[in-house]
Amino acid sequence: MLFLVISEPRPERPSDVAKARQGFWPWMETYQAKGICKHIYPRVGRGAVAIFDVESNEVLHRILNEWADIIPARFDTYPLVDLAVTKA
């Protein structure tokens, strides 16, 4: 199941969350190495945009809860359709 996730961090001073933010990228690298996070890009200003390929909604829910523990944020999630499926 493919999902586009857009994070909108809480409006805190960047310096207040700098230490926690430093742990975000190493944490995300574990999901990239497993092929779960297909792409992730920082947004200009704050936040990130990611494409996840997960087995279930529950897996995505767990990932987003972990993410929010590192950087408290609101998430917009959009289910996607695999391009190969649409061409079949």
Could you describe each region identified by the protein language model?
Residues 1-88:
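Conserved, structured core segments of small domains
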